[in-house]
Amino acid sequence: MARNRQACDCCCIRRVKCDRKKPCKCCLQHNLQCTYLRPLKKRGPKPVKVRNLKKVDDVQVFSKSSSGGIMKVPKALIDQCLRLYNDKLYVIWPLLCYDDLYELLEKRYDETCVYWFLVSLSAATLSDLQTEIESEGGVTFTGIQLSSFCMSSRQEFDDFNGSDIFKIMTYYCLNRCYAQMSNSRTSYRLSCEAVGLIKLAGFHREETLKLLPFDEQQLGRKVYYLLLLTERYFSVYTHCATSLDTTIAPPQPENVTDPRLSLDSFLEMIRVFTVPGKCFFDALATDSANVTCTEDSLKKIWRELHTVPLEIEPWSYGYVDISFSRHWIRTLAWKLVLQISGMRISFLSNSKNTHIPVEIARDMLEDTFLIPKNLYAVHGPGISVKALEIADALVDVVNQYDQNAESEAWNFLFDISKFVFSLKHCDSTLVDKFTTKCQCALITLPLSNPLESTDGSKEDVDALP
């Protein structure tokens, strides 16, 4: 006798086990009429839709496959990030243009080092732009997700066996990610990994680079100077001496018609960070005088970093970083003169000494009036740190000099502090030190609400520019 596909009507209502015969055993025992009139219930999986399949694929990016390997980030998702990087970030930290990156994506996607570089570049792009992207299946990806994916798979791209340009760039990109995520200690450690690898590869020596084709030379020079800038920024706040110096030539200017691919801004940033020299940053890192940090070298900083070259497009992505870095380094030079005992510099006479931070503050405020606020975030926490350093110098003027200087400095401090506290701060440590210093000087800051760190962390160092 054929069995029915579901329980009879009586057994279903009574919620008892049915043998699905007609009549069933339970109905016979209780003298019930056994019927099968109810419509069959739909059971089993729902129909598979194309959209559901795509969503499953995207979710599995961060899951292990049945064979034990790790699923790859889809090409289409990486491609979206590469386009964003080319449009908005290449001018700030140039590695490869979109055409070159797309060629890597299409031809070398299956090569381990190349693949992880592309994923880390995607993570850094989303982190710097503070945005997220959505796949075709509706799954959202962020810089935090992609960078965590890279870090959990570190053994995939770094086997501690030699060095190549893709490993170096991967660590550089990850260092940018963690700078934006308020994790500056990890960011600094990752930058140190990149610096170590670039030395192992010999990219700090002209003899090594000259043996390479021009395109590879150019890429090596870009990466080297990106790390040099990063290391010199960190030296001020980690108090660690630098290891990279201008032992190789910067990348050569490139003839391009697209301003997004111009190296002008990057080459100017290199100039801004190399005019002071390695000795300048080492003196700041060690809080002590360096015999090579002389009066002439400090004069050079003041003279050569006074203005931005005319060829840099005003109030562009590149201009913002150059402008704030100039003001920041000139302020650090002023502080270094006060720090080095016995150094008396003619152009920093007592009468003019008090005016220097005020002049720097005035220049910075003039820039902020014309720069769209959305341009600050892409440079990371470095902009807010550099502005805070200038405000800190004004507090020193208020503390140490005559009443006229104090009044002028206070007026600028009022405006600068409003600007500083309008920016995103990834770490509250430097801000806490600044506000404490102001309270000691009996200065009331123009704050409508108390400033809070974005993550509540209490690290001793801030993050990358």
Curated annotation (Swiss-Prot):
Protein family according to the UniProt entry: Belongs to the MAL13 family.
SUPFAM superfamilies documented for this protein: Zn2/Cys6 DNA-binding domain
Function recorded in the entry: Transcription factor that regulates respiratory growth and plays a critical role in stress adaptation during non-fermentative growth. Binds to promoters of genes involved in non-fermentative metabolism, including processes such as gluconeogenesis (PCK1, FBP1 and MDH2), glyoxylate shunt (MLS1 and ICL1) and the tricarboxylic acid cycle (ACO1). Plays a role in maintaining mitochondrial morphology and function. Also plays a role in tolerance to pH and osmotic stress, especially during the oxidative metabolism.
InterPro entries, alphabetized: Carb_Metab_Trans_Reg, Maltose_ferment_reg_DNA-bd, Zn2-C6_fun-type_DNA-bd_sf, Zn2Cys6_DnaBD
Source organism (scientific name): Saccharomyces cerevisiae (strain ATCC 204508 / S288c) (Baker's yeast)
Secretion signal span: none
Induction: Expression is increased about 5-fold by ethanol.
GO cellular component, one term: nucleus
Protein name (database record): Respiratory transcription factor ZNF1
DNA-binding region residue numbers: 8-34
A GO molecular-function descriptor: zinc ion binding
Alphabetized Gene3D superfamilies for the sequence: Zn(2)-C6 fungal-type DNA-binding domain
Recorded name of the encoding gene: ZNF1
Localisation: Nucleus
PANTHER family: GLUCOSE TRANSPORT TRANSCRIPTION REGULATOR RGT1-RELATED-RELATED, MALTOSE FERMENTATION REGULATORY PROTEIN MAL13-RELATED
CDD domains, per the entry: fungal_TF_MHR, GAL4
Keyword Nucleus: yes
Record-linked PROSITE patterns: ZN2_CY6_FUNGAL_1, ZN2_CY6_FUNGAL_2
Transmembrane feature ranges: none
